[in-house]
Regions:
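Conserved ABC ATPase signature
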Residues: 61-65
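Q-loop/switch helix immediately C-terminal to the Walker
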Residues: 13, 18-32
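Hydrophobic anchor residue at the start of the ABC signature
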Residues: 75
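Short loop immediately C-terminal to the Walker-B catalytic DE motif
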Residues: 92-93, 123
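Conserved ABC ATPase "signature" region
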Residues: 27, 31, 39-57
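Catalytic Walker B motif of ABC-type/P-loop ATPase nucleotide-binding domains
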Residues: 86-89
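ABC transporter nucleotide-binding domain
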Residues: 103-190
């Protein structure tokens, strides 16, 4: 129970009472968590709503909120018992690019005085937010360390080249980072320990390249 009190967990999907205001919903949840003193509870609600930049919306009904705003209410909820560790699962899934950036910045802000652990498949979120990263594939820890050190693992393994659509079909799709039709040719970014085509040029890796290299054991 002592360890549990230190952790706040936000699942990828969580339920709320949509017709309640943000304040009333959090007030109700605070009572369920044992915060019975009305003065203490009011101060706590003000603190968590300001922490997630939702205090100005405290009297608005939750069903009027965007996806990103609801996620912030979720963070406010798990902050109610002042945890030292926040665990959030796929926090930016389903958010539009602008809301994703805002929520990502919120997690960085909250990490200044607590530990924030979040799982995600969005590589950009990791590159922009994390100072430590763990890559887990099928229950196996493939990497743990700094993102910059992880990128180094893909050094000399990333290639770019243009290729005809016919030859593109012969490439191993598991090693294609991305591709784009460019006129009559296809521009390809590819991971391999050796040059995949005669015209392939080595390029500087990024975190996504390194992630794929780890998954493919390159």
């Amino acid at each position: 129970e002592e360890l549990q009190s230190l952790i706040g967990f936000l699942p990828q999907e969580f339920g709320t009472y949509e017709t309640m205001s943000a304040w009333d919903y959090l007030d109700y949840q605070a009572i369920l968590k044992g915060l019975m003193d009305s003065k203490v509870r009011s101060e706590r609600l003000e603190y968590v709503l300001k922490a997630v930049h939702m205090y100005e919306k405290r009297n608005a009904k939750i069903n009027s909120f965007s996806g990103g705003m609801k996620q912030r209410i979720g963070i406010a909820l798990i902050l109610l018992h002042l945890p030292r560790i926040l665990v959030v699962d796929e926090p930016t899934a389903g958010l539009d690019p602008r809301e994703r950036i805002r929520f990502r910045n919120l997690l960085v802000e909250l990490s200044r005085d607590r530990i924030v652990i979040f799982s995600t498949h969005i590589i950009e979120d990791i590159a922009s937010s994390c100072n430590q990263v763990a890559v887990i594939n099928k229950g196996e820890l493939k990497y743990y360390g700094k993102p910059t050190d992880m990128i180094y693992l893909a050094q000399n393994k990333v290639w770019t080249f243009d290729i005809t659509p016919e030859l593109f079909e012969t490439l191993d799709p598991r090693l294609i980072v991305n591709h784009m039709q460019d006129g009559e040719l296809v521009s390809v970014r590819y991971i391999s320990t050796e040059a995949p085509q005669e015209n392939a040029v080595r390029t500087e890796p990024n975190l996504e390249d390194a992630y794929l290299c780890l998954l493919k054991n390159l």
